[in-house]
């Protein structure tokens, strides 16, 4: 789909920016803290756009936000007066999951006349209902993803049902089934409990469940250097999966608790050195495929959420095409240190790219 807001329009806006006062902007949710923390580490100014009633963390961490803008709802950022105010501050917006969810892809692509760090046309690609979606890019890159089932009756092995939660649209009510009969039983139960709707379930993605060890592989694609960097790994803490599974098996069976996978935190990880070659190859191939299919390609961070099988193969089950939200990496990743001599997270790497682009007068190359 062609965007109504063109690269030329955004370039014209950013060309008018005061390079001494460029400001990193984000909406107050998801990964705003790590974005602003990285910006402050690089001495950049910051603005946090908060929804009234959700501003407390951004007020308490006083170092991070130079300015907090309170709105009745996040989507009010689309109002022309608010956009103009942000342009006056020479604001470059940084996208994360909440940015996409609360503003909406159509609005971001067609109505938000603010420079966004990254490729705004790639945000929609995360959605599995999009025609040229993340599976499409993985296939173009030659990267394995789980087998897809086009209808529930095709399920012939353990499968993951990926469906939106009924009440919290930011969350996904994933669940695992062992067969079509198990799917019917669990689907009916979740609809009756109000966890999902039948409409969302009918649109759900059904994937083969791939056993293995989970790693979220975080990369950064730099238009300034032309390189794809491997910044680090994190894993997710999920309720009620963690730490229910640490109970003795007998107690788990006695409790008969329905397992859910709602992400609530992060934990660091590293990977055996002999697997790093595969990791680098995956990042390079995915970046190349994205550049061919969605020019100008990836700008900044992505995450290939992967399973390493018993055969040491990588299977990518989800892709994040914006700030993935992994603040733990800022203090725990050895891989960023291998590049730069110190640990850092995604937020600081974004800020470094913005500063390099300003110094070389190449801001046009990192925003859309």
For every predicted segment, state its role.
Residues 50, 76, 124-215, 220-232, ...:
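Active-site nucleotide/adenylate-binding loops and adjacent lid/helix of ATP-dependent enzymes
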Residues 158-162, 218-219, 306, 312-325:
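A short beta-strand motif that forms the metal-chelation/ATP-contact edge
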Residues 207, 218, 294-311:
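A short glycine-rich, hydrophobically flanked beta-strand micro-motif that places a catalytic Asp/Glu
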Residues 32-37, 56-57, 169:
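Short N-terminal binding/cap micro-motifs at the start of the first secondary-structure element
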Residues 11-48:
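A short, flexible N-terminal coil/short beta segment enriched in small residues
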Residues 51-159, 166-168:
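Conserved N-proximal alpha/beta basic substrate-recognition cap immediately N-terminal to
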Residues 219-290, 320-351:
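ATP-dependent carboxylate/phosphate-activation module, predominantly the ATP-grasp catalytic core
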Residues 1-13:
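Positively charged, low-complexity intrinsically disordered leader regions
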């Amino acid at each position: 789909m062609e965007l109504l807001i063109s690269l030329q329009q955004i370039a014209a806006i950013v060309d008018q920016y005061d390079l001494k006062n460029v400001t990193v902007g984000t909406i107050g949710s998801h990964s705003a803290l790590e974005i602003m923390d990285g910006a402050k580490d690089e001495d950049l100014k910051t603005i946090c756009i908060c929804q009234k009633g959700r501003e407390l963390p951004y007020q308490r961490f006083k170092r991070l936000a130079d300015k907090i803008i309170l709105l009745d709802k996040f989507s009010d950022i689309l109002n022309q007066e608010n956009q103009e105010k942000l342009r006056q501050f020479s604001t470059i917006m940084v996208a994360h999951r909440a940015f996409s969810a609360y503003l909406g892809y159509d609005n971001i692509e067609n109505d938000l006349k603010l420079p966004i760090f990254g490729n705004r046309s790639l945000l929609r690609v995360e959605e599995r209902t999009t025609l040229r979606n993340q599976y499409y890019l993985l296939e173009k890159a030659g990267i394995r993803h789980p087998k897809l089932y086009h209808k529930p009756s095709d399920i012939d092995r353990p499968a993951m049902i990926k469906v939106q939660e009924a009440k919290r649209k930011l969350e996904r009510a994933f669940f695992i089934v062992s067969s079509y009969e198990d799917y019917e039983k669990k689907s009916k139960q979740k609809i009756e409990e109000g966890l999902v709707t039948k409409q969302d379930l009918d649109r759900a993605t059904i994937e083969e469940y791939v056993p293995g060890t989970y790693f979220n592989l975080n990369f950064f694609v730099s238009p300034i250097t032309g390189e794809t960097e491997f910044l680090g790994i994190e894993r997710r803490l999920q309720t009620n999966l963690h730490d229910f599974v640490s109970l003795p098996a007998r107690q788990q069976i006695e409790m008969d608790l329905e397992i859910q996978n709602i992400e609530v935190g992060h934990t660091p990880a590293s990977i055996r050195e002999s697997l790093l070659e595969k990791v680098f190859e995956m990042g390079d191939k995915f970046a190349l495929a994205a550049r061919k299919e969605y020019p100008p390609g990836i700008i900044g961070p992505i995450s290939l959420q992967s399973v390493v099988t018993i055969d040491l193969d990588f299977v990518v089950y989800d892709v994040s095409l914006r700030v993935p939200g992994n603040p733990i990496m800022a203090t725990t990743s050895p891989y960023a240190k291998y590049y730069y001599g110190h640990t850092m997270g995604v937020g600081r790497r974004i800020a470094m790219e913005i500063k390099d682009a300003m110094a070389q007068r190449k801001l046009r190359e990192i925003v859309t």
